[in-house]
Amino acid sequence: PDLLKPIEPWDTQSIIFTSGTTGPSKGVLSSYLHIFTNAGPETWHFVTGEDRFLINMPIFHIGGMGVIFVMLCRGGSIAVMDGFDTEKFWPFVRESRTSAFFLLGVMTTFLLKQEPSQHDKDHSVRLAFMVPLTETCTEFYERFGIDVYTIFNMTEISSPIVSEPNPTKRGTCGKKRDGVDVRLVDENDCEVALGEIGEMIVRTDRPWGMNSG
């Protein structure tokens, strides 16, 4: 049936709640174009429609819901796990034929603490996101044969910083992707010198490419 009202790119697609890092969790209004900018091919170009992405984080948060949007944009598939469980993780990954997943840094530590096995590379996974990137990146890549990426993102923005595979610089978030401007500024919005601490400000070259409020 016809829609009662046409859907426009700037219409609100979802309200996703933040982690509450700096205070109470806040609902973020995301337009259709914000979601596409965050999840579309220009951000994570190495994820394709042939992938099956594991969801092992809450879907009320961008860490879980964002993966759904990423695969919707590509026509790919997802595998849904009840929650992260160190003992059940690899059996589920193998059974579901997962090819990509997202790990918080501490999850990586838990997986590496498991006893090494001859089956460590017996899976179909080709890439993983590690956020934040920890010093275990190289160990994880070598042990499990999985390319590791990292990003800097927030519910309100659209993945402005993305790494190359298997970064070696400890603490890196990656580099500015195409389609965004990123600056580090002081309290007067003046750009700080190289090596100095500043506030990161971001804008996209696409209208409605970030949150609506």
Language model regions located:
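Conserved pre-ATP/AMP-binding loop-to-beta segment of ANL
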Residues: 2-17, 24, 46-52
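Short coil-to-helix segment of the ABC ATPase nucleotide-binding domain corresponding to the Q-loop/switch region
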Residues: 31-32
